[in-house]
């Protein structure tokens, strides 16, 4: 009997060892830990549908029925060309490699007092995000959706963060939905003042940011700054639905202390939920190279000429 039990124990130990090895070999690069193919549901949907013909909850984010695996802990992806699919990240994600693709992923972050995004691609190159969701598990004044550089974002949804997208050079946001951002009365990053919510913020000394056919709707966010805030050269804002903010689009040269060039805002439809009657605010040394085809969404009538002041 003792000998039989020794065989059983040895067999169980061998099976456990084999499972551990298989899990390690099959674990994608950048993972700290993950549950064994446990399905997980995307975070609950909030907000309202996008306007007809524009992205909304039904056309962005993780498709219904997608099997998702939970990944816990902060992750760094340093392997060129890696494809990451069907993950729910409970932790902050950083990309340092070239050509990493995230497909059908959910970014939830973790509790933190540090200012950081759910996904940071600033140190990578040619990152692609497709059909993904950004929604913090622990909303705070510190958490943005994505800090992006050399990144293409398609059919993705951002909600519950302070800013949706902080965009650096060569960032494209297309067919995506940014809405219901989180406002806080006290933001250490704003000197203790309230949060300064932007759907997309494009930074000074950056260039080539493109926003194409998105819904960026801050009409349900308390006291937002702008749907689009930009100090980046060669900005393109094309064929979007835009709403909310003090002014809906705010183009500002002042962080540069030089003229801001190549701003193109064309073919957009504007809501009427800005604090001021101000679809576009243009600072005095900002050049609006093109502004054709911008209309009020409810009437189809052309919007007024940009307000211009610093």
What role is predicted for each listed range?
Residues 2-25:
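Secretory targeting and sorting signals
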Residues 17-41:
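C-terminal region of N-terminal signal peptides and the immediate post-cleavage residues
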Residues 38-70, 258, 262, 266, ...:
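Acidic, glycine- and Ser/Thr-rich low-complexity intrinsically disordered tracts
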Residues 42-56, 122-127, 137-140, 221, ...:
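N-terminal non-globular leader segments, chiefly Sec-dependent signal peptides
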Residues 45-108:
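N-terminal segments that cap or nucleate solenoid repeat domains
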Residues 60-62, 70-72, 203, 211-217:
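Beta-strand/loop edge motif enriched in small/polar residues
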Residues 69-72, 89-91, 109-121, 136-145, ...:
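Extracellular beta-strand/beta-solenoid scaffold signature
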Residues 81-88, 99-109, 124-136, 148-162, ...:
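Right-handed parallel beta-helix
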């Amino acid at each position: 009997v003792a000998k039989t039990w020794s065989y059983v124990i040895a067999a169980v130990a061998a099976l456990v060892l084999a499972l551990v090895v298989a899990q390690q070999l099959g674990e994608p690069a950048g993972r700290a830990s993950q549950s064994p193919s446990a399905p997980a549901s995307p975070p609950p949907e909030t907000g309202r549908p996008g306007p007809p013909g524009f992205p909304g909850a039904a056309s962005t984010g993780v498709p219904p029925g997608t099997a998702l695996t939970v990944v816990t802990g902060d992750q760094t992806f340093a392997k060129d060309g890696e494809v990451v699919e069907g993950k729910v990240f409970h932790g902050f994600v950083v990309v340092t490699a070239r050509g990493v693709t995230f497909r059908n992923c959910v970014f939830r972050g973790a509790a933190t007092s540090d200012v950081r995004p759910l996904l940071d691609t600033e140190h990578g190159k040619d990152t692609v995000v497709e059909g993904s969701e950004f929604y913090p598990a622990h909303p705070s004044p510190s958490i943005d959706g994505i800090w992006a550089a050399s990144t293409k974002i398609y059919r993705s949804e951002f909600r519950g963060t302070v800013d949706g997208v902080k965009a650096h050079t060569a960032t494209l946001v297309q067919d995506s939905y940014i809405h219901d951002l989180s406002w806080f009365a006290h933001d250490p990053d704003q000197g203790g003042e309230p949060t300064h919510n932007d759907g997309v913020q494009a930074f000074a000394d950056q260039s080539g940011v493109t926003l194409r056919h998105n819904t960026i709707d801050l009409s349900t966010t308390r006291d937002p700054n702008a749907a689009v805030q930009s100090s980046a050269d060669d900005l393109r804002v094309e064929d979007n639905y835009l709403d909310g903010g003090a002014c809906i689009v705010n183009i500002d040269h002042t962080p540069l202390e030089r003229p801001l060039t190549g701003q193109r805002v064309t073919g957009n439809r504007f809501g009427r939920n800005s604090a001021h009657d101000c679809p576009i605010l243009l600072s005095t040394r900002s050049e609006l190279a093109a502004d054709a085809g911008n209309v009020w969404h409810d009437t189809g009538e052309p919007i007024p000429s940009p307000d211009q002041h610093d």
